[in-house]
């Protein structure tokens, strides 16, 4: 009976260690994530510029709307990468982690926008601190695509 339990445990560990559907995604799918992230970076830069130049809430909101739209484009490219990598394995896991990080980052940008509009300096500083903390983590996950998605 012990042997059967041990064999079952080993078999279960092997099944978990060898993802059945994992596959290498096409380079174009991986590259699209990079393109969308570059565009997201430009959107972040536009928000930074708008924060110092906009005189109205509508002007500021316009730059945030563009940022959120590009954030959704990044999210869609990560979903495509996850699907193209067979929805399992190290590449799919990295894509899912990056997607979760992007969702969290976008929530922080929503908080930053709200705090800025309300002129709540402490809340804006807190949201900006979260963004500064999360950005390198997400960048590290995305950089792992170089090894995990080949």
Predicted feature locations:
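Short, solvent-exposed, charged loop/turn and helix-capping segments
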Residues: 72-99, 145-150
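Short helix-adjacent coil turns
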Residues: 112, 116-123
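Short, charged, amphipathic alpha-helical segments
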Residues: 31, 58-69, 92-103, 121-136
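Immediate post-signal-peptide N-terminus of mature secreted/exported proteins
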Residues: 21-69, 145-150
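Bacterial N-terminal signal peptides
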Residues: 7-17
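Short, intrinsically disordered, charge-biased short linear motifs at domain edges
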Residues: 37-50, 74-81, 130-139
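Bacterial N-terminal signal peptides that target proteins for export
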Residues: 1-7
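Extended, amphipathic, non-transmembrane alpha-helical segments
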Residues: 105-108
């Amino acid at each position: 009976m012990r042997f059967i339990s041990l064999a079952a445990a080993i078999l279960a560990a092997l099944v978990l260690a060898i993802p059945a559907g994992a596959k290498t995604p096409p380079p174009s799918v991986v590259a699209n994530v990079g393109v969308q992230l570059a565009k997201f970076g430009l959107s972040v830069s536009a928000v930074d510029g708008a924060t110092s130049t906009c005189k109205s809430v509508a002007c500021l909101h316009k730059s945030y709307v563009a940022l959120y739209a590009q954030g959704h484009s990044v999210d869609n490219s990560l979903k495509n990468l996850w699907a193209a990598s067979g929805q399992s394995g190290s590449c799919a896991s990295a894509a899912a982690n990056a997607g979760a990080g992007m969702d969290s980052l976008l929530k922080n940008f929503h908080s930053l926008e709200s705090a800025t509009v309300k002129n709540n300096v402490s809340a804006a500083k807190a949201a900006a601190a979260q963004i500064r903390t999360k950005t390198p983590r997400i960048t590290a996950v995305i950089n792992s695509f170089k090894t995990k998605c080949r």
